[in-house]
Amino acid sequence: MGLLDAGITKHNVLITSVDNVLNWARLSSLWPMGFGLACCAIEMMATNASNYDLERFGIFPRSSPRQSDLMLVAGTVSMKMAERVVRLYEQMPEPRYVLSMGSCSNCGGPYWEHGYHVLKGVDRIIPVDVYVPGCPPRPESLIGGLMKVQELIRMEQIGISRADALKKLAEKSVDPRVVIEEERKALRA
Protein backbone atom coordinates (compact mmCIF):
# COMPACT_ATOMS: atom_id res chain seq x y z
CA MET A 1 0.00 0.00 0.00
CA GLY A 2 1.73 3.09 -1.23
CA LEU A 3 0.70 6.71 -1.22
CA LEU A 4 -1.02 6.41 -4.59
CA ASP A 5 -2.93 3.27 -3.59
CA ALA A 6 -4.54 5.04 -0.63
CA GLY A 7 -6.50 7.39 -2.90
CA ILE A 8 -7.07 11.10 -2.60
CA THR A 9 -9.33 12.26 0.19
CA LYS A 10 -10.64 15.72 0.99
CA HIS A 11 -8.51 16.12 4.11
CA ASN A 12 -5.23 14.86 2.74
CA VAL A 13 -2.26 16.94 3.93
CA LEU A 14 -0.69 17.05 0.48
CA ILE A 15 -3.90 18.20 -1.24
CA THR A 16 -4.57 20.82 1.44
CA SER A 17 -1.09 22.28 0.99
CA VAL A 18 -1.46 22.32 -2.80
CA ASP A 19 -4.84 24.05 -2.41
CA ASN A 20 -3.28 26.74 -0.24
CA VAL A 21 -0.38 27.37 -2.63
CA LEU A 22 -2.57 27.47 -5.74
CA ASN A 23 -5.16 29.73 -4.12
CA TRP A 24 -2.48 32.08 -2.81
CA ALA A 25 -0.94 32.34 -6.28
CA ARG A 26 -4.33 32.99 -7.92
CA LEU A 27 -5.52 35.62 -5.47
CA SER A 28 -2.14 37.35 -5.39
CA SER A 29 -2.05 37.79 -9.16
CA LEU A 30 -5.60 38.54 -10.24
CA TRP A 31 -5.71 39.79 -13.84
CA PRO A 32 -9.07 41.44 -14.60
CA MET A 33 -10.34 42.37 -18.02
CA GLY A 34 -12.61 45.40 -17.88
CA PHE A 35 -15.69 45.38 -20.07
CA GLY A 36 -16.95 48.92 -19.61
CA LEU A 37 -20.20 49.77 -21.34
CA ALA A 38 -21.55 52.91 -19.65
CA CYS A 39 -21.14 55.18 -16.62
CA CYS A 40 -19.68 52.44 -14.41
CA ALA A 41 -16.69 52.23 -16.75
CA ILE A 42 -15.64 55.72 -15.61
CA GLU A 43 -15.55 54.55 -11.99
CA MET A 44 -13.71 51.40 -13.06
CA MET A 45 -11.08 53.56 -14.77
CA ALA A 46 -10.84 55.73 -11.65
CA THR A 47 -10.19 52.61 -9.60
CA ASN A 48 -7.28 51.72 -11.88
CA ALA A 49 -5.73 55.16 -11.34
CA SER A 50 -2.92 55.86 -8.91
CA ASN A 51 -5.25 57.08 -6.13
CA TYR A 52 -6.40 53.54 -5.38
CA ASP A 53 -3.35 51.55 -6.58
CA LEU A 54 -4.87 48.15 -7.35
CA GLU A 55 -1.43 46.70 -7.92
CA ARG A 56 -0.88 46.57 -4.15
CA PHE A 57 -3.54 43.83 -4.13
CA GLY A 58 -1.80 42.01 -7.00
CA ILE A 59 -4.46 43.17 -9.46
CA PHE A 60 -3.05 44.04 -12.88
CA PRO A 61 -5.58 44.91 -15.64
CA ARG A 62 -5.31 43.04 -18.93
CA SER A 63 -6.87 43.88 -22.28
CA SER A 64 -7.07 40.36 -23.70
CA PRO A 65 -9.53 37.73 -22.48
CA ARG A 66 -6.92 35.03 -23.08
CA GLN A 67 -4.65 36.61 -20.45
CA SER A 68 -7.28 37.42 -17.82
CA ASP A 69 -9.00 35.39 -15.14
CA LEU A 70 -11.60 37.95 -14.02
CA MET A 71 -14.14 39.77 -16.16
CA LEU A 72 -15.46 43.09 -14.84
CA VAL A 73 -18.79 43.83 -16.53
CA ALA A 74 -19.56 47.49 -15.89
CA GLY A 75 -22.60 49.18 -17.35
CA THR A 76 -25.70 48.59 -19.43
CA VAL A 77 -25.58 45.34 -21.39
CA SER A 78 -27.78 45.66 -24.47
CA MET A 79 -29.13 42.67 -26.38
CA LYS A 80 -26.65 43.34 -29.20
CA MET A 81 -23.72 43.45 -26.78
CA ALA A 82 -24.76 40.25 -24.96
CA GLU A 83 -23.30 38.03 -27.70
CA ARG A 84 -19.92 39.73 -27.35
CA VAL A 85 -19.95 39.37 -23.57
CA VAL A 86 -20.53 35.62 -23.93
CA ARG A 87 -17.80 35.33 -26.58
CA LEU A 88 -15.26 37.11 -24.38
CA TYR A 89 -16.23 34.98 -21.39
CA GLU A 90 -15.74 31.78 -23.40
CA GLN A 91 -12.27 32.94 -24.50
CA MET A 92 -11.07 33.28 -20.90
CA PRO A 93 -9.03 30.37 -19.49
CA GLU A 94 -10.23 28.38 -16.49
CA PRO A 95 -10.60 29.16 -13.64
CA ARG A 96 -12.48 32.32 -14.56
CA TYR A 97 -14.51 34.69 -12.46
CA VAL A 98 -17.06 37.41 -13.22
CA LEU A 99 -17.75 40.56 -11.23
CA SER A 100 -20.89 42.48 -12.18
CA MET A 101 -20.51 46.17 -11.39
CA GLY A 102 -23.42 48.59 -11.10
CA SER A 103 -27.20 48.43 -11.21
CA CYS A 104 -27.40 48.13 -15.00
CA SER A 105 -25.25 45.02 -15.26
CA ASN A 106 -26.71 43.55 -12.06
CA CYS A 107 -30.41 43.85 -12.90
CA GLY A 108 -30.96 46.20 -15.85
CA GLY A 109 -30.81 49.42 -13.84
CA PRO A 110 -33.31 52.15 -14.66
CA TYR A 111 -34.07 50.41 -17.97
CA TRP A 112 -35.26 47.14 -16.45
CA GLU A 113 -38.99 47.75 -16.89
CA HIS A 114 -39.40 49.56 -20.21
CA GLY A 115 -36.07 48.97 -21.92
CA TYR A 116 -36.73 46.17 -24.39
CA HIS A 117 -33.17 46.47 -25.69
CA VAL A 118 -31.48 46.02 -22.29
CA LEU A 119 -30.53 42.71 -20.73
CA LYS A 120 -32.08 42.41 -17.26
CA GLY A 121 -28.83 41.38 -15.63
CA VAL A 122 -25.64 39.92 -17.05
CA ASP A 123 -26.22 36.79 -14.95
CA ARG A 124 -28.80 35.70 -17.53
CA ILE A 125 -26.04 34.95 -20.05
CA ILE A 126 -22.90 34.20 -17.98
CA PRO A 127 -22.42 33.05 -14.37
CA VAL A 128 -21.62 35.93 -12.00
CA ASP A 129 -19.54 35.36 -8.87
CA VAL A 130 -19.71 38.79 -7.18
CA TYR A 131 -22.18 41.67 -7.54
CA VAL A 132 -21.20 45.26 -6.73
CA PRO A 133 -24.30 47.45 -6.27
CA GLY A 134 -24.57 51.15 -7.00
CA CYS A 135 -25.33 53.57 -9.79
CA PRO A 136 -22.42 53.91 -10.42
CA PRO A 137 -20.59 52.28 -7.52
CA ARG A 138 -17.69 54.17 -6.02
CA PRO A 139 -14.15 52.86 -6.51
CA GLU A 140 -14.12 51.76 -2.86
CA SER A 141 -17.10 49.49 -3.58
CA LEU A 142 -15.34 47.98 -6.57
CA ILE A 143 -12.25 47.33 -4.45
CA GLY A 144 -14.51 45.63 -1.89
CA GLY A 145 -15.94 43.46 -4.67
CA LEU A 146 -12.46 42.55 -5.88
CA MET A 147 -11.55 41.56 -2.33
CA LYS A 148 -14.67 39.33 -2.24
CA VAL A 149 -13.40 37.61 -5.39
CA GLN A 150 -10.08 37.07 -3.62
CA GLU A 151 -11.93 35.57 -0.63
CA LEU A 152 -13.79 33.26 -3.00
CA ILE A 153 -10.49 32.15 -4.55
CA ARG A 154 -8.99 31.60 -1.08
CA MET A 155 -11.85 29.21 -0.20
CA GLU A 156 -11.59 27.05 -3.33
CA GLN A 157 -10.52 23.45 -2.87
CA ILE A 158 -9.83 20.53 -5.14
CA GLY A 159 -12.98 18.43 -5.26
CA ILE A 160 -15.37 21.16 -4.01
CA SER A 161 -17.54 23.00 -6.51
CA ARG A 162 -17.59 26.78 -6.77
CA ALA A 163 -21.29 26.79 -5.83
CA ASP A 164 -20.41 25.29 -2.43
CA ALA A 165 -17.63 27.85 -1.99
CA LEU A 166 -20.12 30.64 -2.77
CA LYS A 167 -22.50 29.27 -0.13
CA LYS A 168 -19.68 29.28 2.46
CA LEU A 169 -18.76 32.85 1.50
CA ALA A 170 -22.38 33.96 1.86
CA GLU A 171 -22.53 32.37 5.32
CA LYS A 172 -19.41 34.30 6.37
CA SER A 173 -20.69 37.64 5.04
CA VAL A 174 -22.19 39.97 7.61
CA ASP A 175 -25.20 42.15 6.82
CA PRO A 176 -24.42 45.63 8.23
CA ARG A 177 -28.11 46.18 9.03
CA VAL A 178 -28.03 43.22 11.43
CA VAL A 179 -24.91 44.56 13.17
CA ILE A 180 -26.44 48.03 13.58
CA GLU A 181 -29.67 46.55 14.97
CA GLU A 182 -27.71 44.40 17.45
CA GLU A 183 -25.74 47.46 18.58
CA ARG A 184 -28.98 49.40 19.09
CA LYS A 185 -30.41 46.59 21.21
CA ALA A 186 -27.22 46.48 23.28
CA LEU A 187 -27.37 50.24 23.88
CA ARG A 188 -31.02 50.04 24.98
CA ALA A 189 -30.31 47.27 27.47
Swiss-Prot record:
UniProt: [4Fe-4S] cluster binding residues: C39, C40, C104, C135
Cellular location(s): Cell inner membrane
GO annotation, biological process: aerobic respiration; electron transport coupled proton transport
EC number from the UniProt entry: 7.1.1.-
Enzyme superclass (EC): translocase
InterPro entries named in the record: NADH_UbQ_OxRdtase-like_20kDa (IPR006137), NADH_UQ_OxRdtase_20Kd_su (IPR006138)
Cofactor: [4Fe-4S] cluster
Keyword Metal-binding assigned: yes
CC cofactor note: Binds 1 [4Fe-4S] cluster.
Its membrane topology: Peripheral membrane protein
Catalytic activity, reaction form: a quinone + NADH + 5 H(+)(in) = a quinol + NAD(+) + 4 H(+)(out)
GO molecular function (one): NADH:ubiquinone reductase (non-electrogenic) activity
Similarity remark: Belongs to the complex I 20 kDa subunit family.
Quaternary structure and partners: NDH-1 is composed of 14 different subunits. Subunits NuoB, C, D, E, F, and G constitute the peripheral sector of the complex.
Function, as annotated: NDH-1 shuttles electrons from NADH, via FMN and iron-sulfur (Fe-S) centers, to quinones in the respiratory chain. The immediate electron acceptor for the enzyme in this species is believed to be a menaquinone. Couples the redox reaction to proton translocation (for every two electrons transferred, four hydrogen ions are translocated across the cytoplasmic membrane), and thus conserves the redox energy in a proton gradient.
Protein's name according to its UniProt entry: NADH-quinone oxidoreductase subunit B
